[in-house]
Amino acid sequence: MARAPPPLSSLPPPPRRPTVVLLLGLALAFCLAVLSIQSSFFTAPRLASRLDLDSDEVRALSGFQSRVQQCVARRGLGLTADIIDHCKLVLRFPKGTNSTWYNTQFKYFEPLEYNYDVCETILLWEQYRNMTTVLTREYLDVRPDGWLDYAAKRIAQLGADKCYNRTLCEELLSVLLPAKPPFHPRQFATCAVVGNSGDLLKTEFGQEIDAHDAVFRDNEAPVNKKYAKYVGLKRDFRLVVRGAARNMAPILKGSSDEVLIIKSLTHKEINAVIKELPNPVYLFQGIVLRRGAKGTGMKSIELALSMCDIIDMYGFTVDPNYTEWTRYFSPPRKGHNPLQGRAYYQLLECLGVIRIHSPMRAKRVEDWSDIPSREEIRTAHAAAFRLKRHETGQSDQMGPFSNCKVWGTVDPDYGPVSGTPDMSETRKSSNYKKWEVLPFDSLRMEAQEHHVQMGGVSLYKMDGNKLDDLVCVRHERSSS
């Protein structure tokens, strides 16, 4: 039998509605809606304008990515490029590639795919065409704490973490520290960067290498009649690590004009050797590539790009089925991650930074038409630059000085040439300082024009891979 409902008098009273709180909430929501509409009204045109601008850059970069993808497919010896977006892509080696390189630090075999940001890469390397890559006195003078902090990082066995005794640090650096840049952007039209790979013995590149305006070599790689038909005889620049710098006398034997660039540090023992040599010797001033190829070869490309229009690269080939790291003049040895380097070099070729010459391409007639043209690269660089500026909220100022963080000015008579009073008579009587005292009007016309376009300003990297931090030094013109 159904139970009758309780009388109304026995039901609990309905809860009181928080009318005041509810009304306040509605009022607040209404105000926020009005504020949002007003904000949208005033910001929508600016946002739309920015989106339109960004979309233009995205379209330009997407088209460039397609060109890079096609270039990798044609020139990559099996490598393929998968586009992620307008800036990012992945380079992949084919399945079955022999990945035998074991990273003992992180406990894994070398991977077969590598992620790259093309926008970041093209900004970095195109900027290098305007850079100075030799450490100078003007850089240390202009950079904040240049002598106290940075100079100490370039001297081994200093006994302190900073140059508290500047006089001592100047004594240790003076033998290889020019006052101003001894080399200039656009100084050479064509340059060859010659590595040490055993693949060089498979093709006779010697005459082709020697035909370049300047040749860059690494560490202790020999240049003699035995290997002349493979690697040539021309010797202009040599980039060495500190260990090889200790043996620079036998390395440089036979060429008093070959310029030696020490990649990392100097110290008393190296300085003692320099004082006996007739060769120009300097310290490298560059960047740290954490996601690119490793080793002295990559630094040689950086060095060459700061002086040369076209860079041809020999002796860095890695066959996809490599089994060991080989050198043309000695037994196989431990080296750097070959596949990572091979992938990055291929990316650089398809960005117009280098041209790779390989025994695996020897039977081909070299045709560079599948590499993006300089005009395409300039367009992509401008798009990447503007996009980066908008993303970081910076101004649209274009030009080579937009990333200058520190400015300085030096007069025409600034600073001494490199050297010390206790150098040997061999060095004092040599022509080691010829690049430092080279008359401006003897430079290649393109180098002179670039200098004028830059307003006599030299650009230096400040720290690591940061694209936005440059030390910029303006050289005042002589009144005569």
From Swiss-Prot:
Superkingdom, natural source: Eukaryota
Sequence similarity: Belongs to the glycosyltransferase 29 family.
Descriptive protein name: Sialyltransferase-like protein 5
Entry keywords, A to Z: Glycoprotein, Glycosyltransferase, Golgi apparatus, Membrane, Signal-anchor, Transferase, Transmembrane, Transmembrane helix
PANTHER family: SIALYLTRANSFERASE-LIKE PROTEIN 1
Glycosylation sites (chain numbering): N98, N130, N165, N321
Catalytic activity, EC: 2.4.-.-
Transmembrane segments: 18-38
GO molecular function: sialyltransferase activity
Gene label: STLP5
Top-rank EC class of the record's enzyme: transferase
GO cellular component terms, A-Z: Golgi membrane; Golgi trans cisterna
Lineage of the organism: Eukaryota, Viridiplantae, Streptophyta, Embryophyta, Tracheophyta
Alphabetical GO biological process terms: pollen germination; pollen tube growth; protein glycosylation
Primary role: May possess sialyltransferase-like activity in vitro.
Keyword Oxidoreductase recorded: no
Ranges per topology, Lumenal: 39-480
Compartment(s) of residence: Golgi apparatus membrane
Cytoplasmic side: 1-17
Topology in the lipid bilayer: Single-pass type II membrane protein
Main localisation: Golgi
